[in-house]
């Protein structure tokens, strides 16, 4: 693999050994850092050869990155807070090679806003078995790690999630993610109409109360249904999971539907998709996701804007459920 210069003078020997050990761990760190940026094992191998002038096999690179697997396990099992005011659940899809066949797998990310108003990734799981049974196991895992109560869970229409939340956390409010709702509505709308349609949708979710929101829903449906017949169907079908937002003040709503927190995290995850079209295994995907998460969350030091006001309002609305 690689050789180190030897020195004849025996009194220098211990120093050389120390230096050599340090160099190896230093290279490990560099390999892990490159992997975190989404580079493939082949790209890392080529970069190591360019920089250090020695060859490393792709399996060696893979073995080095496997050293973080115990760390991932510890992180996935770490104790969590008893109460989270808000959780966001999202899915990002990746192509993964499985016994020579390329499959689409989802990485499910749960992001929490804790009682201090700080963001925290609770867990990441990779799978293709989206169902009420699967989501119930995810919810129970959170409970086993110490979570006793969640006020609001925001998620897209993931199969079975609503039922699983109701079973595991009966008092928790399920809120459809407004950003996804809007995105799904506009998905098949051509550019020429998209801006006007998006502006009209805003009149629904930014309405001051539910009555005005329903009136806006009727107006928008009447206006756009002739041109795009199914575009507004999801709003009517999902209304019971969209409407909880109207009981909150603008400040709280902004925290709930301005999903900057999860959107910025997602852009980090999407970068991985751009850098690799296919992951060699679900373990390789999990390693890349964990390292990308670790990099992204290092910058998360600030509290959510207006958190004191948000917390105060949530404390009144969900009486006795938040620590004072």
Where are each of the predicted segments found?
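Short, small-residue-biased leader/transition segments that mark boundaries at the very start
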Residues: 2-9
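Acidic/histidine-rich catalytic cores and adjacent linkers
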Residues: 170, 203-324
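DNA-recognition alpha helix
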Residues: 42-53, 291
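Short, basic interhelical loop/turn and adjoining N-cap
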Residues: 49-60, 227
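Structured nucleic-acid-interacting core domains from mobile-element enzymes and related host factors
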Residues: 55-116, 126
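Conserved beta-strand -> loop -> alpha-helix junction used to position metal-binding or nucleic-acid-contacting
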Residues: 152-159, 164-200
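Active-site beta-loop-alpha junctions of metal-dependent nucleic acid enzymes
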Residues: 22-23, 124-146
